[in-house]
Amino acid sequence: HLSMNTNGGAQDVEWWKELAIIMGRKGHVTFSFDGLGDTNHLYRQGVNWENCMKNSAAFISKGGRARWEFIIFDHNQHQIEEARELAKKMRFDDFRTKKTGRFFSTVKHEGKESHQGMNRKGQETQKLEKPKDEYINNALKQEKNLVNKYGSMDHYYDVTDINCKSIEKSEIFVTAEGHVFPCCWLGGQQYKWYWKPKEAPIWNMIKDPNNINAIYNELKDIIEGNFFNMIENSWS
């Protein structure tokens, strides 16, 4: 089964129609639409809403299986049901809301009330505010209890058991460059705006990106290779 996540703003309708035919019913595309025409661009910087609608409709028109995934913020929480109805009208197979973990600082390892968006140049863009409590990620609600029990989040990370979702579901993540990772969370560590190129800690494990590139290697060799083993060994 092949799945692809996209903001839906790139390419033209003919490209999306062709993709639907190529994927058939054995795969699906998750369109990350976080709001409607007046709000989606606040998080999806530079994405044109009309293109999103045309491209997703074109994909569905040729039998493509489409899922609408909606990340909830303060600025779009009032649009959830309207977006759900639009997804039904457009014949999306599924509509899912996502309670984001973005209101947790991965630098300070603590919760925060807002999240300052940045572009690739490190410039501030949209400031994202937390939604209502019912839309807060459940894991974020456990922070205070975990700190009280373990003393700090760092100590909790050191002693907690890790249940790898990718192992449980037999999944892998392939970047647009062809790099193979267990999941998108690790793949996304390559290019954080606050790290200079190839200075993020994940590069200490990657070393030569060609070694984990599916263009040059068999998937089996990558999955059974040093990079995946190093990740698993780091848990103990």
Predicted regions and their residues:
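Radical SAM enzyme [4Fe-4S]-AdoMet core and its adjacent flexible, acidic
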Residues: 18-217, 221, 229-230
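Active-site metal-binding loops of divalent metal-dependent hydrolases
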Residues: 8-9, 35
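Conserved Radical SAM active-site core
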Residues: 1-3, 9-25
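Immediate flanking context of iron-sulfur cluster ligation sites
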Residues: 226-236
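Short His-Asn-centered micro-motif
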Residues: 6-7, 168
